[in-house]
């Protein structure tokens, strides 16, 4: 954050004299995982473990069951499982990894699946077709519109929180 860079010893008098931008090529392959959890706590606690295990996802989205239900009603199709093996799903992670080839991604997905299952995930579902990926991200992307369609009261719907502050924020 540039704000945090200028706050501190220099305060508002600081001047950035040089900035280096590193441009990376677009990834050739991506894979998204839908990871259901029974409860919110184990779902939230799993997020920082991706980084601790050097899995480095491109995106990690935390979603509660109620918002998924609202979003799916809004887009008119169901994407996320509500129950698996008789266990009600209370929260989800939607995680995307990218890489240069599918062999590399398969290794990452295998490590990620092992880690999240150890942390209490009910299952790991791979959105392995363009339609499944599109539907999962469409449900995620329509949160705001779905909530606005159901209520006139809206505080914050889509916030960005540092990984180590998620539990505190919620």
What are these regions (language model features)?
Residues 1-170:
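Noncatalytic alpha-helical scaffold of FAD-dependent oxidoreductases
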């Amino acid at each position: 954050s540039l704000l945090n860079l200028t706050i501190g010893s220099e305060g508002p008098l600081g001047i950035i004299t040089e900035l280096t931008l590193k441009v990376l090529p677009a990834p050739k392959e991506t894979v998204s995982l839908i990871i259901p959890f029974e409860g919110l706590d184990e779902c939230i606690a799993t997020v920082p473990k991706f980084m601790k295990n050097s899995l480095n996802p491109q995106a990690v989205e935390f979603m509660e069951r109620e918002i998924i239900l609202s979003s799916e009603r809004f887009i008119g199709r169901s994407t996320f499982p509500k129950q698996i093996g008789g266990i009600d799903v209370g929260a989800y992670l939607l995680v995307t990894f990218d890489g240069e080839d599918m062999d590399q991604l398969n290794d990452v997905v295998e490590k990620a699946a092992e880690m999240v299952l150890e942390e209490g995930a009910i299952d790991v579902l791979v959105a392995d077709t363009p339609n499944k990926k599109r539907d999962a991200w469409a449900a995620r992307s329509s949160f705001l519109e779905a909530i606005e369609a159901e209520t006139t009261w809206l505080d914050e719907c889509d916030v960005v929180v540092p990984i180590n502050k998620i539990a505190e924020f919620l």
